[in-house]
């Protein structure tokens, strides 16, 4: 196989895309990073970069036609997926495929596939396109419930409603966190689950492979900590892998899928799936013999996927900083790195207005509990320069 002539265009150039571009660069693959703002993290390591509105069909199609990439790899949801469907019909390679990208960009599409077509176990749910519909569906779902915008990313607009006086506030929060013109929400019965996992699932030319389950803690719908492996029963793991294979087979294409699942005893509930590397999977940068970004690349270009191994119990902690500056300066890294079991990735984001994920702490230890505690200790050292 000659991969030197491959050209990859990344749509969305955040921190996950940066690690993917680095993986491609290491194999001599030409890379193009695209986003709506200049100097995005992945642009800092790509051969070429372009700033466009990826929701603008004309701008997106013109750039793709001009650059003629071998593979088009979406990193975010805020892309004109109708254009990707059109381009795929003209023999462009969309990763994993245009169908998967379009279906997973909104919760209504993917929940319909999972619950109605595949009959996967999910929480009780309903959709609402107006505030009155929202109030109506609450009557059948009951308290407590989770509300999420139909279209959003990184936990924006999500909240758990436990009391009646939180209902109006949660609707407004969902509207403010919704992406684009979509105003619909999904209302889900709150499952009092034991834990939640991400099961990184790799579809490739030789079949489907799984990484060890990743446990994680979320706050306000966004990842804060993750660890691998997460201990679970053989029964729950087998069910999780079965669900992950079923949903990813239905979506199709090659690449890494981040399948989010709720576990209660040996019961497994499908939550969401992303057709790309997952933020909780950043722990694989330290935990696995082949990290999720390298796996995504290998699956896309047709390179072998050997046995995926967890080398040691590991954890990650999102470096979430708060400030208001166009030139962020981060300090405390020297103190955090004094521990030989700690590594750090700083994403290269300069602007911060409010809270923003600026990097990740990676740790390894003899067990995940110690790795997680070590990540929290390292995280405590890191802050913006005052």
Curated annotation (Swiss-Prot):
Pathway: Purine metabolism; IMP biosynthesis via de novo pathway; N(2)-formyl-N(1)-(5-phospho-D-ribosyl)glycinamide from N(1)-(5-phospho-D-ribosyl)glycinamide (formate route): step 1/1
Positions bound to ATP: 107, 148, 153-158, 188-191, 196
Binding site for N(1)-(5-phospho-beta-D-ribosyl)glycinamide: 15-16, 75, 279, 349, 356-357
Domain ATP-grasp: 112-301
Pfam family, one: RS_preATP-grasp-like
Superkingdom of origin organism: Bacteria
GO MF terms, alphabetically ordered: ATP binding; magnesium ion binding; phosphoribosylglycinamide formyltransferase 2 activity; phosphoribosylglycinamide formyltransferase activity
SUPFAM superfamilies: Glutathione synthetase ATP-binding domain-like, PreATP-grasp domain, Rudiment single hybrid motif
UniProt keyword Ligase present: yes
Enzyme Commission number(s): 6.3.1.21
Class in the EC hierarchy, top level: ligase
Keywords assigned by UniProt, alphabetized: ATP-binding, Ligase, Magnesium, Metal-binding, Nucleotide-binding, Purine biosynthesis
Reaction equation(s) it catalyzes: N(1)-(5-phospho-beta-D-ribosyl)glycinamide + formate + ATP = N(2)-formyl-N(1)-(5-phospho-beta-D-ribosyl)glycinamide + ADP + phosphate + H(+)
tRNA-binding among keywords: no
Annotated Mg(2+) binding sites: 260, 272
Subunit organization: Homodimer.
Role this protein plays: Involved in the de novo purine biosynthesis. Catalyzes the transfer of formate to 5-phospho-ribosyl-glycinamide (GAR), producing 5-phospho-ribosyl-N-formylglycinamide (FGAR). Formate is provided by PurU via hydrolysis of 10-formyl-tetrahydrofolate.
Sequence similarity: Belongs to the PurK/PurT family.
This protein's name: Formate-dependent phosphoribosylglycinamide formyltransferase
Organism of origin: Francisella tularensis subsp. novicida (strain U112)
